[in-house]
Amino acid sequence: KEICFPRLGCFSDDAPWAGIAQRPL
């Protein structure tokens, strides 16, 4: 599964940073 952001692009949700997906940058 991947998470996509308009400004950041797409990333795997198993990446180390996945925890920030639930927070604004």
Curated annotation (Swiss-Prot):
Localization (cell) = Secreted
Documented activity regulation = Inhibited by bile salts, is reactivated by (pro)colipase/CLPS.
- Give each disulfide bond as a residue pair: 4-10
The protein's UniProt keywords, in alphabetical order, are: Disulfide bond, Hydrolase, Lipid degradation, Lipid metabolism, Secreted
Catalysed transformations (reactions):
a triacylglycerol + H2O = a diacylglycerol + a fatty acid + H(+); 1,2,3-tributanoylglycerol + H2O = dibutanoylglycerol + butanoate + H(+); 1,2,3-tri-(9Z-octadecenoyl)-glycerol + H2O = di-(9Z)-octadecenoylglycerol + (9Z)-octadecenoate + H(+); all-trans-retinyl hexadecanoate + H2O = all-trans-retinol + hexadecanoate + H(+)
What EC number(s) are associated with this protein in UniProt?
3.1.1.3
Please name the GO terms of the biological process aspect recorded for this protein, alphabetically: lipid catabolic process
UniProt keyword annotation of Disulfide bond present:
yes
Q: Which GO terms describe its molecular function?
A: all-trans-retinyl-palmitate hydrolase, all-trans-retinol forming activity; triacylglycerol lipase activity
Q: Which family does it belong to?
A: Belongs to the AB hydrolase superfamily. Lipase family.
| Role according to the record | Plays an important role in fat metabolism. It preferentially splits the esters of long-chain fatty acids at positions 1 and 3, producing mainly 2-monoacylglycerol and free fatty acids, and shows considerably higher activity against insoluble emulsified substrates than against soluble ones.
| Record protein name field | Pancreatic triacylglycerol lipase
The organism encoding this protein is Felis catus (Cat)
